[in-house]
Amino acid sequence: MKHNISVTGIKLYAYHGCLDEEALIGGHYIVDVSLETDFTQAAKEDALEKTIDYVDVNAIVAQEMAIRSKLIEHVGQRIWDRIINEIDGLKHLSITIKKLRPPINGNVDEVSITIEGEVN
């Protein structure tokens, strides 16, 4: 049996980007995190301590998004590193960061990066 916990649509305002204006003005971001785990015992026992607490996942995302970076790729890697080091029981992890209305030439709704893979 495969179990997934998803924390999707985490809306944040942050100051990432290579342009000076982005450091001053900031922009809107949406982060999605999907975690594969085994929550059989948590489901049987109704026990939060036997599964991944999505409050912790949300906190990690918010803390890392608050640290300015030029690249959302860098932010995504920091989120990945913290989740795999701080949350037990992971089998697979996927993180997507969407930068809404990026300041690039053209009419673009969003740009995004995804980091996904197995966790040992």
Residues covered by each model-derived region:
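N-terminal, polar/charged subdomain of small-to-medium soluble alpha/beta proteins
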Residues: 1-120
